[in-house]
Structure formats: C-alpha cells, structure tokens
C-alpha cells in the first residue's frame, strides 16, 4: 500500500522515451546528490530538497502472494521515515552535531544510484523518477550495513545550480527486517 494509488501506478508502467538531454541531467543530479551525501556535505544536500519535501520510507513486511499489495505500509500507517521539511531540518541538526551518539564517530557511506527512469511528469517541470540504489555504510570498526531498494522521487526543475529539487522521495527498501543499529543517515 504505497502512497496513493495514482502515484504508485505511474511507477509500474513502462516509461515513454524521453529526451537524452533530460535523462542525462537527471542522472547527473542524482550522482551529485550521492557525492554530497558520501562527502557528508549535508547542508548542501539539504539545499536540494524542496520546502514542501515529503521524505517517506514505509515499513516492509513479508506477505503471502494474495496480500502482496499490503507489503509496504501506507502513508497513514507506521513508517521508518515520514518527514516534512521541519523534521528533515531536525535530522540535519542532529546528524551534524557533536552530541548525536548514533553518528559520533560518523558513518562512512557510499551511495550508488542506477536504473534511473523518468516514468512520468506530474506538471510542467515536475518529473516522476524511479531509481535503484545501494547504500553501503561502515561505522566504528566492525559495523557494516548494506541497504538496497528503489527510490521513487518527484523532481521539480528550478533555477539552482543543481537544476532540480526533490519534492517527494519514497524509499522502498528491499529488506523487511532491518538489522542495522540505526537509520541515522539519508538515502
């Protein structure tokens, strides 16, 4: 039960061809975003988020085939993240402070983004994007976490140097049981 039915439907269809220039721009935006996260340049990364951001990571459960549509929690149910700009600012303050025990010492991350598909356009200058990701995180000496999944984003074109802002991000993680000590980083 991911988000609203209409938004989820666009991600299930084969995307129409897009201009190679747009595809390249979107991919470069995601590579830049990954670099900012990997380099812990969180304030610069935060500038890529729209003021009306919705950052959502539903909980995944293992279901039998007939209940597979209920595999992910919905927007009015429990979630790992269900954040707006205010919540994201709080997370940013925490992750960059010296008092956050979950990130002091800091995690070392590597964000890999691939399979970037522009699957639709909501409005003029807004694009629905599906991408696959792997986030590798190493913390302390022996703590190692690997997360894989799909991100479903709405990007809005803007006049910033990056060219886009993230309006909506839904993170569909492949794991149903998260073995990591915390989720104190960004996807």
Curated annotation (Swiss-Prot):
<keyword id="KW-0058">Aromatic hydrocarbons catabolism</keyword>
<dbReference type="InterPro" id="IPR000391">
    <property type="entry name" value="Rng_hydr_dOase-bsu"/>
</dbReference>
<comment type="subunit">
    <text>This dioxygenase system consists of four proteins: the two subunits of the hydroxylase component (BnzA and BnzB), a ferredoxin (BnzC) and a ferredoxin reductase (BnzD).</text>
</comment>
<dbReference type="GO" id="GO:0018619">
    <property type="term" value="F:benzene 1,2-dioxygenase activity"/>
</dbReference>
<keyword id="KW-0560">Oxidoreductase</keyword>
<dbReference type="GO" id="GO:0042203">
    <property type="term" value="P:toluene catabolic process"/>
</dbReference>
<keyword id="KW-0520">NAD</keyword>
<dbReference type="GO" id="GO:0042184">
    <property type="term" value="P:xylene catabolic process"/>
</dbReference>
<dbReference type="GO" id="GO:0019380">
    <property type="term" value="P:3-phenylpropionate catabolic process"/>
</dbReference>
<dbReference type="InterPro" id="IPR032710">
    <property type="entry name" value="NTF2-like_dom_sf"/>
</dbReference>
<comment type="pathway">
    <text>Aromatic compound metabolism; benzene degradation; catechol from benzene: step 1/2.</text>
</comment>
<comment type="pathway">
    <text>Xenobiotic degradation; toluene degradation.</text>
</comment>
<dbReference type="Pfam" id="PF00866">
    <property type="entry name" value="Ring_hydroxyl_B"/>
</dbReference>
<comment type="similarity">
    <text>Belongs to the bacterial ring-hydroxylating dioxygenase beta subunit family.</text>
</comment>
<protein>
    <recommendedName>
        <fullName>Benzene 1,2-dioxygenase subunit beta</fullName>
        <ecNumber>1.14.12.3</ecNumber>
        <ecNumber>1.14.12.11</ecNumber>
    </recommendedName>
</protein>
<keyword id="KW-0223">Dioxygenase</keyword>
<dbReference type="GO" id="GO:0018624">
    <property type="term" value="F:toluene dioxygenase activity"/>
</dbReference>
<comment type="function">
    <text>Catalyzes both the oxidation of benzene and toluene. The beta subunit may be responsible for the substrate specificity of the enzyme.</text>
</comment>
């Amino acid at each position: 039960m991911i988000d609203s039915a209409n938004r989820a439907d666009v991600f299930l269809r084969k995307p129409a061809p897009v201009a190679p220039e747009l595809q390249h721009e979107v991919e470069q935006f995601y590579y830049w975003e990954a670099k900012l996260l990997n380099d812990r340049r969180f304030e610069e990364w935060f500038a890529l988020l729209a003021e009306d951001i919705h950052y959502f990571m539903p909980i995944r459960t293992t279901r039998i085939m007939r209940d597979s549509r209920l595999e992910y929690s919905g927007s009015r149910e429990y979630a790992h993240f269900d954040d707006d700009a205010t919540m994201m600012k709080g997370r940013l303050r925490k992750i960059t402070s010296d008092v956050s025990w979950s990130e002091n010492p800091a995690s070392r991350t590597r964000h890999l983004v691939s399979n970037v598909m522009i699957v639709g356009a909501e409005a003029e200058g807004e694009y629905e994007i599906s991408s696959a990701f792997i986030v590798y995180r190493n913390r302390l000496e022996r703590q190692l976490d690997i997360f894989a999944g799909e991100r479903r984003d709405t990007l809005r074109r803007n006049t910033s140097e990056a060219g886009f802002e993230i309006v909506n991000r839904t993170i569909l993680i492949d794991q149903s049981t998260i073995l990591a000590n915390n989720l104190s980083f960004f996807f």
